[in-house]
């Protein structure tokens, strides 16, 4: 028989290793980072044509519900591109010591409180703009540090 303290310790360690943020995408059971495809790789600091990737791409199917990774306030709209295309939308979320930009979503609102795991919005149609890409939610820390450990 396994002592209760060992079971509790194992559960706490497992939770800590999983990161403090909630699952971001309803179509995935965990926050899985996009691997490489013809458009590039989804991990933090992956090489791009003229720059490094400033965030992490979390796999998610087009049209899926996207959840708030932590409790906080949506403090405004964020747009990843200068042009108007079908996926040029997102938000800035701040709270619990975190600040992130989340791109490629149609948010339910651009300002206001939200709880961890609550519906934040819906993933926009990445396949329309980037056919064959692994559809994903882009998550970027406001200070440009690596968010991977929190996922």
From Swiss-Prot:
Positions of disulphide bridges: 25-60, 36-41, 99-142
Keyword Signal: yes
Main location: secreted
Tissue: Highly expressed in liver and weakly in testis. Not expressed in heart, brain, spleen, lung, skeletal muscle and kidney.
Keyword field contains Disulfide bond: yes
Record InterPro entries: Dup_hybrid_motif, LECT2, LECT2_chordata
Cellular compartment(s): Secreted
Binding of Zn(2+), residues: 53, 57, 138
GO MF annotations in UniProt: identical protein binding; metal ion binding
PANTHER family membership: LEUKOCYTE CELL-DERIVED CHEMOTAXIN 2 (PTHR11329), LEUKOCYTE CELL-DERIVED CHEMOTAXIN-2 (PTHR11329:SF0)
Annotated family: Belongs to the LECT2/MIM-1 family.
Record protein name field: Leukocyte cell-derived chemotaxin-2
């Amino acid at each position: 028989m396994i002592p209760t303290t060992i079971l509790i310790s194992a559960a706490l360690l497992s939770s800590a290793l999983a990161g403090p943020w909630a699952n971001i995408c309803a179509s995935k059971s965990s926050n899985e980072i996009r691997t490489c495809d013809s458009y590039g790789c989804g991990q933090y600091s992956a090489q791009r044509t003229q720059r490094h990737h400033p965030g992490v791409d979390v796999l998610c199917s087009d049209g899926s519900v996207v959840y708030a990774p932590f409790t906080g306030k949506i403090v405004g709209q964020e747009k990843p591109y200068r042009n108007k295309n079908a996926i040029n939308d997102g938000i800035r979320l701040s709270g619990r010591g975190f600040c992130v930009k989340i791109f490629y979503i149609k948010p339910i609102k651009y300002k206001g409180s939200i709880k961890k795991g609550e519906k934040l919005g819906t993933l926009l149609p990445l396949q329309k703009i980037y056919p064959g890409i692994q559809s994903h939610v882009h998550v970027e820390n406001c200070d440009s540090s690596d968010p991977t450990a929190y996922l």
